[in-house]
């Protein structure tokens, strides 16, 4: 990485995204990832200062939800609005959903209800076993809506990591080795003593 922020990556044939670890105190202009395009050689990530609901000492709260398993956008506004209002009242820095959004209809509907703009704070998603659906590979639809299935971000004084399960209702397009390779690289850049929290729907491996 150069002083002006430009970077060069050798690439990896199994990767479909380029993504960054959003640093604490900032947010991306649009999103933390870009899909790798065959004819595209440059990718830019715009960051802007963002304190969110993080205290000066770095401490913060977050809301963790899972298994909402919706199939449409009807009759869900009330509970989604309750989560949003609770996040505001508790000054939650972000919301994390750790999977089982649920099947094709749920994957397409959930993002319309619970997203960063609607919830008034960053919203992150993790894939669950019922979020692998029929396609070229199980997470294809999830990736097209929510982005990569493994990534990390910083909030306050904590490093957060999102990892997928080994598989679900349909075969994934990655292996545990792919995720572990990335995870080792991610952790190698963490300052010693930094608290680390890992989110997943179920363990990547039981070994």
Language-model regions, residue ranges each:
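Short, acidic/polar N-cap/turn motifs at the starts of alpha helices
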Residues: 30-33, 42, 148-152
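A short, solvent-exposed loop/turn motif at the edges and junctions
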Residues: 15-35
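N-terminal active-site segment of His-dependent metallophosphoesterases
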Residues: 22-24, 35-109
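Short, surface-exposed beta-strand/beta-hairpin micro-motifs centered on an aromatic residue
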Residues: 2-11
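Active-site neighborhood of phospho(di)ester-bond hydrolases with catalytic His/Asp-centered motifs
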Residues: 64-66, 94-100, 122-129, 163, ...
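Active-site-proximal beta-strand elements of phosphoester/diester hydrolases
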Residues: 59-72, 157-167, 197-200
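Long, structured stretches of catalytic cores involved in phosphate-ester chemistry, encompassing
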Residues: 194-197, 204-207
């Amino acid at each position: 990485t150069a002083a002006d922020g430009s970077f060069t990556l050798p690439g990896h044939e199994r990767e479909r995204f380029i993504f960054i670890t959003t640093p604490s105190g900032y947010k991306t202009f649009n999103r933390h990832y870009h899909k790798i395009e065959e004819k595209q050689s440059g990718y830019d990530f715009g960051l802007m200062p963002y304190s969110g609901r993080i205290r000066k000492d770095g401490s913060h709260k977050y809301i963790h939800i899972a298994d909402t398993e919706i199939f449409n956008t009807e009759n869900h506004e009330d509970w989604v609005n309750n989560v949003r209002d609770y996040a505001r009242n508790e000054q939650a820095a972000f919301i994390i959903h750790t999977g089982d959004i649920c099947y094709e209809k749920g994957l397409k509907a959930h993002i319309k209800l619970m997203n960063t703009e609607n919830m008034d704070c960053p919203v992150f998603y993790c894939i669950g076993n019922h979020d692998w659906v029929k396609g070229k590979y199980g997470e294809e639809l999830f990736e097209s809506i929510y982005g990569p299935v493994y990534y990390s971000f910083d909030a306050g004084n904590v490093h957060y990591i999102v990892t997928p399960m080994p598989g679900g209702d349909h075969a994934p397009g990655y292996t545990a080795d792919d995720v572990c390779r990335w995870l080792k690289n991610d952790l190698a850049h963490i300052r010693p003593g930094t608290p680390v929290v890992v989110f997943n729907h179920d363990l990547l491996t039981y070994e």
